[in-house]
Swiss-Prot record:
Protein name: Nucleolar complex protein 4
Highest taxon of source: Eukaryota
UniProt organism field: Saccharomyces cerevisiae (strain ATCC 204508 / S288c) (Baker's yeast)
Coiled-coil spans in chain: none
Function comment: Involved in nucleolar processing of pre-18S ribosomal RNA and ribosome assembly. Has a role in the nuclear export of 40S pre-ribosomal subunit to the cytoplasm. Its subcellular location and association with pre-40S subunit are unaffected by RPS19 disruptions, suggesting it acts before the ribosomal protein.
Remaining remarks: Present with 1630 molecules/cell in log phase SD medium.
Length: 552
């Protein structure tokens, strides 16, 4: 950059103060100065960024003045002259050159800089001016959608401070995207409407389709919020002074939003993005779809992912929320749903952070009294078996869950109290001998490898695992498990009291517990643990050494 701030200020002052068109050629000189030096990793090292930011703001002031003078507005055909039209067209070409420079800054700078944020703000302020001065006639509704479309391309081309998929959500941390989302997209209804509309058209353009589909992280950063213009409680403003009435068409917005989502869901998603989408799908995606049933294929594929990909992890668990929403609201019929739900229950489930989410949903799915006792018994038995190798924080969730299931499905009580194995004082010697033989030869009939919960023989089994838990090393688990050795007087447990327990909360509860009586302790006080290195056993002889005869 050759021009100094003082020179830029002088040129800008002459251009904005006077209406002399001879000075307008200086605009081209200023635009040509708006160039980012090559092979630069940051602009803060010198005055370059400061000068470029000042140049951008000066050019914005100049073009705002040109808008107010009407130099960028084509005159009506009656008042038009050839000279006037040529001048306006020349001004517009210079104006387009400035916008192109701004877009280049937004899309090409690979490092975080305030210049990019300034360029974004200036570009959108220019779009606001266009909505007033580029309308077909004064006061006519207008939104500069072509200008906006170019901005979308620049945003999706930007890699400013890009740390794609590093966040646990899989969303982009691109500074430009974050700024655009927080400052514009989540605040203005017209920007949301035209963004979805133009994005949809770009997805249909082969020239830009690949660019958009590869940057799902930016899309997630943009739409992962509750302030969509189709939301009932969204309190959004209008960005341009007089937008077209089309922005009130909620159905069209939902249709575009839906098409964009479906296109991106068919693209390449990272595992983190997959999880993030499934986490928000039931609250932030389905309500804004015009036809939510179009998500059926995506959700069923996600739910079935476990059988085809052992590394899928929690994806089927997260897909449950969306599936349940479609089943509840749109009567989605899913074949073998309970078989798939049963297959999700495995040792890994007890260690994932979405365990509470899964148990909340499973509580709903297994609450129906129309379910067969064999099916419910399989879920009870499999959960009980998993407690033998689960952490205490998971076990304290499973125990009340099993208790509630047995209360809802009394036919499963036989797994706890089987009359065939109970002796009574009126039995004959032969009956006593037969009972003894029956107990000695007992083999648990439960087939843990069977994938169909109707065929596991769980109802013929017993919950001996719960008896093992009564002797668990953790006192909370042992105490809680003993509820099964008592009469079932409690109606049910409130599962919310148990779902969010972890090692930290268990330790905190134990350490903060107030004891009614202090435990009785007996101990001896020692001044040393070992004898001195020189073998001096004087202290040992006096009884002040814990390990006499051992030198350290």
């Amino acid at each position: 950059m050759v021009l100094l701030i003082s020179e830029i200020k002088d040129i800008a002052k002459r251009l904005t103060a006077a209406g002399d068109r001879k000075q307008y050629n200086s605009i081209i000189k200023l635009i040509n100065e708006l160039v980012i030096p090559e092979n630069v990793t940051q602009l803060e090292e010198d005055e370059t960024e400061k000068n470029l930011r000042f140049l951008v703001m000066s050019l914005f002031q100049i073009f705002r003045k040109l808008f107010s003078r009407g130099d960028l507005t084509l005159p009506s055909s009656k008042k038009s002259t050839l000279e006037k039209e040529q001048f306006v067209n020349w001004c517009r070409k210079v104006y387009e050159a400035f916008k192109t420079k701004l877009l280049a800054i937004i899309s090409d700078i690979p490092f975080e800089t305030s210049l990019g944020l300034d360029s974004l703000d200036v570009y959108l302020q220019l779009a606001e001016l266009e909505s007033t001065h580029f309308a077909s006639e004064k006061g006519a509704p207008f939104f500069p959608n072509k200008t906006f479309r170019k901005l979308i391309i620049a945003l999706w081309s930007s890699n400013m401070g890009e740390i794609e998929d590093v966040k646990s959500s899989g969303a982009s941390e691109n500074l430009i995207i974050v700024e655009f989302t927080e400052k514009y997209y989540t605040k203005f209804a017209d920007i949301q409407y035209y963004f979805q509309s133009e994005f949809n058209q770009l997805l249909e353009d082969p020239a830009y389709q690949d660019l958009l589909l590869k940057n799902v992280g930016k899309w997630l950063a943009l739409v992962n919020h509750d302030k969509h213009c189709s939301s009932v409680d969204a309190d959004l403003e209008i960005f341009v002074p007089n937008p077209p009435q089309a922005i009130e068409n909620e159905s069209k917005f939902k249709s575009n939003f839906e098409k964009n989502w479906l296109s991106l869901l068919n693209g390449q998603l990272s595992l983190q993005q997959y999880k993030s989408i499934l986490l928000i799908l039931h609250k932030r995606i389905i309500p804004h779809f015009h036809t939510p049933t179009k998500l059926m294929d995506f959700l069923t594929d996600s739910y079935n992912l476990q059988s085809s990909n052992k590394n899928a992890g929690v994806v089927p668990i997260l897909a449950l929320n969306g599936l349940f929403e479609l089943m509840k609201r749109f009567n989605l019929e899913y074949p073998n749903f309970y078989m798939k739900l049963y297959q999700i229950i495995n040792p890994d489930l007890m260690h994932v952070k979405y365990r509470a989410r899964f148990f909340r949903l499973m509580d709903v799915f297994l609450s129906s009294t129309h379910l067969s006792a064999h099916l419910v018994a399989s879920f009870i038995k499999k959960l009980a078996r998993l407690t033998l190798e689960s952490p205490p924080s998971a076990i304290v969730t499973v125990i009340p869950f099993i208790y509630n299931l047995i209360r809802k499905h009394p036919n499963c009580m036989i797994m706890l109290h089987n009359p065939a194995f109970i002796s009574n004082p009126f039995q004959t010697p032969d009956q006593v001998a037969n009972l003894k033989t029956l107990k000695e030869n007992y083999v648990d009939p439960f087939d843990v490898h069977e994938s169909d919960p109707e065929l596991t023989h769980a109802l013929d089994s017993s919950l001996w695992e719960l008896a093992s838990l009564m002797e668990h090393y953790h006192p909370n688990v042992a105490t809680l498990a003993k509820i099964f050795a008592q009469p079932f007087k409690k109606l049910s447990y409130n599962m919310e009291d148990f779902l969010d327990w972890n090692y930290d909360s268990l330790l905190n509860a134990e350490s903060s517990r107030k004891l009614k009586t202090l435990p009785t302790l007996e101990f001896e006080a020692f001044t040393n643990v070992f004898d001195n290195e020189d073998g001096d056993s004087e202290a040992s002889s006096q009884g002040n050494v814990y390990l006499p005869g051992v030198a350290w």
